[in-house]
Amino acid sequence: MRVGISLLTLAPSDLGGSETYARQLTRTLATVGTHEYTAFVPARAKDAAGGLSTVEVRDTPAATRGPSRIPALAISSLRSREVRSELDHLDVVHYALTVPLPRTDLPTVVTLHDVQHRDLPEFFGPGRRSFRRIAYDRAARNAAAVIVTSEFVRGRAVELLELDPTSVHVVPHGVDHSVFSPGDDEREPFILYPARPWPHKNHARLIEAFTRLRETRPRLRLLLTGGGLERLDPLPEGVTSLGSVSTERIVALYRRAACLVFPSLYEGFGLPPLEAMACGCPVAASNTGAIPEVCGDAAVLFDPLDADAIAAAVLEADERSSELREKGLARAAEFGWERTARLHEDVYVAAASEAPVGMPTTS
């Protein structure tokens, strides 16, 4: 079978877990995949598809945020027409980043990473809400198959988008255990939160909890990583922003941190807790969205709306560090990208056997 995978809206270092997913999926399919693959990539991320055969599309502003996103998608749509001839030999097209470009009449598979714009619309401006409803919702409804990352997203998508439950397939993300692995480092008195400062990431409440912890633990520090953290300035004493860091640096931080704290208000999956667990780092995380489903009993869960609960969970994670380390290593071992890739291949076969739906092309 011949499968096209679209990564056309990938913006390096801007999409967080979605970018990790896209890169790991294509890299793994290049190694273990049993079908013939072609990846459609933007010039700005021409290396994103690992070892797959690629079709490069001129750079577009499609991954920009805010009110400019919809006109940017119009530009992307025009440019994606340049590659439509490359679709002729395919059987299925997978929109790994949800946005349905390039358009096609072939059966499509859509990865729907979450439906946050439906569950928490207040976190999106009018332009982004409209964009997601136009691009994400329509793509999912027109797809022969929809891939979601958790039972949580599956339930919300079926309810809110009125999708056929039989067409929605849960395929969890994986962990690259060749990279995320435990070390012999001594734990240090800092807690770690790797996240861009998007509203649902809940930095303000974490910082409030941290200032309370510092009252009794003055040596404790909070380290933040991720792009755009300058928006949080000025930061209180004890809080340090490291900005965007390399994978090697984040692994080193996981191995040394007293714990990972993950206070997100909404996640369709949530990779950092699993990556931290794979490095032997204790985890304290929100009890919302897909996070409890992903973490199982290997993390201390808390109410992310309660700063006192966050602080208490950090203390509990520290007290139970040895237990959580062992539980976390076992939990993370259940998630691997090879399994994720093989489950994707099952969905591609299922989609190809369905009557073509696709996203109609325009002249």
Say what each PLM segment does:
Residues 1-363:
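Carbohydrate transferase catalytic cores enriched for Leloir-type hexosyltransferases
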